[in-house]
């Protein structure tokens, strides 16, 4: 067996599907929000491997919640491209754990990697609680070291994000790039907006962001040029539910000869909370 075969054998298999044409962006490859959607699909299999089945979670009033996701995009996926998901535990903590996910094609070429911090959540008290002992035992058997190809590269892993008011963000230089409501079909089995739709708000804000900075994105695409996201980090600060109104504010943090670093902040219009 090769070292890669040995490594893959340690991971929990799960999602297996393809990229649909309607999931691809104006550059012709899978929109980044759908990578996060695949990550959510893979999470079902990881919860199952950890003994967290949907019925027992509902009956006990518990769930899991993503607190931070760091993603690196290693290869573009186009319409019809096959995707195979696998995952493992990287670090087990009292109320949270770090999970590794990866997606590869049918030839095992790496497409994307995720380093995700998840927590065990009391759905009634709306707070994190300790993992069940049975889950801790299963997690210990599914643990690996984070592979180098998933380590943060240009976007560092973060820490807990404190609330920043919309007014303070605007004063810092953020400007409005998007706005939308939360639909019922965007919410997961735990009742809050699925992570991929947090990312969707950002991908929809992107063209407005560059247009407001004076960059003609349609013209770029017509000339055979465009943008590709290589790495991103998501911090989930507050839950969003069906009917909430979300506003996206953005700022250009850094520009280099090969790329740029952009920060987006999502605000709940009704409560003013950073989401």
What are these regions (language model features)?
Residues 2-15, 72-84, 89-163, 236, ...:
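HotDog/MaoC-like acyl-thioester-processing domains
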Residues 2-68, 115, 119-231:
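Hot-dog-fold acyl-thioester-processing enzymes
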């Amino acid at each position: 067996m090769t070292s890669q075969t040995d490594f893959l054998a340690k991971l929990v298999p799960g999602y297996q599907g393809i990229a649909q044409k309607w999931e691809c962006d104006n550059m012709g490859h899978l929109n980044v929000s759908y990578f996060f959607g695949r990550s959510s699909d893979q999470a079902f299999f990881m919860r199952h491997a950890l003994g967290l089945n949907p019925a027992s979670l509902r009956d006990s009033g518990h769930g899991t919640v993503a607190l931070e996701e760091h993603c690196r995009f290693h290869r573009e996926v186009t319409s019809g491209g096959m995707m195979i998901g696998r995952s493992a535990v990287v670090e087990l903590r009292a109320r949270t754990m770090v999970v590794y996910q990866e997606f590869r094609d049918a030839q095992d070429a790496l497409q994307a990697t995720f380093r995700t911090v998840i927590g065990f959540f009391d759905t009634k008290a709306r707070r994190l609680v300790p993992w069940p002992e049975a889950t801790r035992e299963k997690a210990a058997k599914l643990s690996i070291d984070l592979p180098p190809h998933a380590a943060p590269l240009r976007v560092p892993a973060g820490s807990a994000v404190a609330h920043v008011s919309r007014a303070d963000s605007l004063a810092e230089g953020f400007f409005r790039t998007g706005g939308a409501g939360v639909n019922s079909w965007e919410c997961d089995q735990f009742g809050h907006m699925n992570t991929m739709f947090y990312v969707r708000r950002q991908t929809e804000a992107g063209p407005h962001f560059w247009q407001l900075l004076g960059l003609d994105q349609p013209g770029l695409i017509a000339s055979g040029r465009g943008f590709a996201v290589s790495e991103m980090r998501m911090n989930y600060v507050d839950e969003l539910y069906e009917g909430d109104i979300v506003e996206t504010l953005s700022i250009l943090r850094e520009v280099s000869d090969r790329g740029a670093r952009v920060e987006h902040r999502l605000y709940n219009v009704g409560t003013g909370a950073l989401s």
